[in-house]
Amino acid sequence: MKAAIYHAFSHKEAKDHDVQELGSQRAEAFVRAFLKQSIPHMSQEDCESHLQRKAVILEYFTRLKPRPRPKKKSKGLSAKQRRDMRLFDIKPEQQRYSLFLPLHELWKQYIRDLCNGLKPDTQPQMIQAKLLKADLHGAIISVTKSKCPSYVGVTGILLQETKHVFKIITREDHLKVIPKLNCVFTIEIDDFISYIYGSKFQLRASERSAKKFKAKGSIDL
């Protein structure tokens, strides 16, 4: 603290400025006398207390840690942009039934695992409930009823499903777009046949998993 209040001249500084050098004791006595003369109302005890105090740092600068910049989320393409770019279109050279048979085999294994093996004693209602919420891409689907006679009998592997249509590749390598509205479809796997009423099935595949389907006695097209 003493060094913060006063500092003794070096021999060279004293000689350069023509200042008489003081010993440490004389310098300390000078400071005490100066304080007593400058602040006469302060007692000797308070002066000693002030001399013993630590220096107060008026300003203290800390290095601020650089804030991490938020990562920019990659913005994907919108549904309209994907349609405009025709990303969902199946190229003519890829419209071959044999090309998607492995997909059908994968789908059958997926449904067997989903229904715990499709055993003969399995309740049909349970299989129906599972199929309604399952991913149908790769299933062999048939149109059994329709208000448009030309759709009846169309059978093939389901390649794409949207909210309103099924896209099916037939054994003749024809890509058919079948509307769900006013059509009844069947899906068969391991001798189990499930009926799908398209008019009540107008949902995206991702939305069906959370949809609660209610059993009804009869449904018209």
From Swiss-Prot:
Domain of life from the UniProt record: Eukaryota
Gene Ontology biological process terms from the UniProt entry: tRNA 5'-leader removal
Modified residues (Phosphoserine): 10
GO cellular component: multimeric ribonuclease P complex; nucleolus; nucleoplasm; ribonuclease MRP complex
InterPro entries: RNase_P/MRP_Rpp29-subunit, RNase_P/MRP_Rpp29_sf, Rof/RNase_P-like, Rpp29/RNP1
MF terms (GO), sorted A to Z: ribonuclease P activity; ribonuclease P RNA binding
UniProt keyword terms in alphabetical order: Nucleus, Phosphoprotein, tRNA processing
Subcellular locations according to the entry: Nucleus, Nucleolus
Primary role: Component of ribonuclease P, a ribonucleoprotein complex that generates mature tRNA molecules by cleaving their 5'-ends.
Family per record: Belongs to the eukaryotic/archaeal RNase P protein component 1 family.
Subunit and interaction comment: Component of nuclear RNase P and RNase MRP ribonucleoproteins. RNase P consists of a catalytic RNA moiety and 10 different protein chains; POP1, POP4, POP5, POP7, RPP14, RPP21, RPP25, RPP30, RPP38 and RPP40. Within the RNase P complex, POP1, POP7 and RPP25 form the 'finger' subcomplex, POP5, RPP14, RPP40 and homodimeric RPP30 form the 'palm' subcomplex, and RPP21, POP4 and RPP38 form the 'wrist' subcomplex. All subunits of the RNase P complex interact with the catalytic RNA. Several subunits of RNase P are also part of the RNase MRP complex.
Protein name (database record): Ribonuclease P protein subunit p29
Gene name for this UniProt entry: Pop4
